[in-house]
Regions:
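Generic structural signal for well-ordered, non-transmembrane alpha-helical segments
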Residues: 193, 220-227, 253, 257-264, ...
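Glycine-rich beta->alpha junctions and the first turn(s) of the following alpha-helix
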Residues: 145-227
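Hydrophobic packing residues in well-ordered alpha-helices of helical domains and bundles
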Residues: 47, 188, 219-222, 248, ...
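Buried hydrophobic positions in well-ordered alpha/beta secondary-structure cores of metabolic enzymes
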Residues: 99-101, 195, 229, 275
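A short core secondary-structure module
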Residues: 105-140
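Glycine-rich phosphate/cofactor-binding loops in nucleotide/flavin-utilizing enzymes
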Residues: 277-319
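C-terminal helix-coil-helix/basic helical segment that borders enzyme active sites and/or dimer interfaces
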Residues: 2-6, 228-261, 268-282
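Glycine-rich flavin
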Residues: 2-111, 313
Length: 319
């Protein structure tokens, strides 16, 4: 992989690099790519992941025989979040779909060409649409965005006033498809890769002449957690790549939880072992920590744990 043209401080160059990539042919290869990019620069992986996810969704639709009337060129995002006080609706008239309303958490909307967006088609159902973000009927807000991590990956609302959109699948297809679970673990692969340089810093500290037993304890805790997470990611990729299982959603949530906890462990061990110096004197280290802390908030923490427990309690999730 040659990511020399990609930079966390140059969004346009990063997106141009992302669009030049040929998407990996397997799920495992995709996650490996994302992890390797995140190990180099977390923010670049954060920009690449939704683009690859969008291309994967469009490819999945094609495999299922869904007719999507568009060419998948340019840079893509995936906007599926919901927020209090905001609602994006889709209306159908004379064979044309248009979108109306607001959508929160639209990462890089000002920089991307297009996005796959979920919108409400009635009071209970959402449907996926392809939206041209350069359409004059789309207004991209610049904030609020005061993040210290992922500073350039602005995730603000968009307002849409009648922009024409292309449907991708029927209502509910986006959430029902097997690839929905796959995409969630792709984000976790970014988290995992982003934490590897912190493990390297801990190893360097533990190998120094001034190291004591506590330095080795901090390293061991981070190393063990990341090793377990890698094992889980590999097994999950193998299961999904072989055709999945009857509980792909549960398996994906388990994997994301294991990885998120491993990365949080690594962040904590690095903070305790290395102290404040790299956070104030090492720009790359400080940026990586800040980026990971923001990125990890895509994990739903205790809510995901409650979902896992609920599924298991009702008889799902056999090993």
């Amino acid at each position: 992989m040659d990511a020399d043209g990609a930079s966390a401080t140059d969004v346009a160059a990063t997106l141009a690099w992302a669009t030049s990539l040929v998407p990996p042919r397997s799920l495992g290869a995709t996650w490996e790519l994302l992890a390797s990019v995140a190990a180099r620069e977390v923010a670049v992986a954060r920009m690449l992941e939704p683009h690859l996810d969008a291309l994967s969704i469009l490819a999945e639709a094609t495999r299922e025989g869904i007719d999507v009337d568009l060419e998948p060129g340019g840079s893509w995002g995936v906007f599926a979040a919901e927020g209090s006080g905001m609602r994006l609706e889709a209306r159908h008239h004379d064979g044309v779909w248009t979108l109306h309303g607001s959508k929160p958490w639209c990462s890089l909307a000002a920089d991307l060409d297009r996005a796959l967006v979920t919108a409400w088609v009635d009071d209970e159902r959402r449907q996926l649409f392809a939206l041209d973000l350069r359409d004059p009927a789309v207004r991209v807000r610049t904030g609020p965005w005061h993040a210290r991590g992922l500073e350039r990956v602005v995730s603000a609302p968009i307002d849409v006033d009648g922009a024409v959109a292309v449907p991708v699948g029927e209502p509910g297809w986006y959430l029902r498809r097997p690839g929905f679970a796959h995409g969630g673990v792709g984000v976790a692969a970014c988290w995992w890769g982003g934490a590897l340089p912190l493990r390297d810093a801990l190893r360097e500290a533990a190998a120094s002449d001034r190291a004591d037993q506590l330095s080795r304890v901090h390293l061991a805790r981070a190393d063990t957690a990341l090793w377990v997470a890698r094992t889980v990611l590999r097994e999950t990729a193998a299961v999904f790549g072989a055709g999945g299982s009857a509980s792909e959603g549960l398996r994906a949530t388990r994997a994301r939880t294991v990885v998120a906890e491993a990365v949080e462990t690594t962040l904590a061990e690095a903070a305790h072992a290395l102290g404040p110096l790299p956070l104030v004197a090492d720009e790359a280290h400080a940026r990586r920590v800040a980026d990971l802390q923001i990125y990890l908030r895509q994990h739903h923490g205790e809510r995901d744990a409650a979902r896992i427990g609920g599924d298991i309690a009702t008889g799902a999730g056999t090993w």
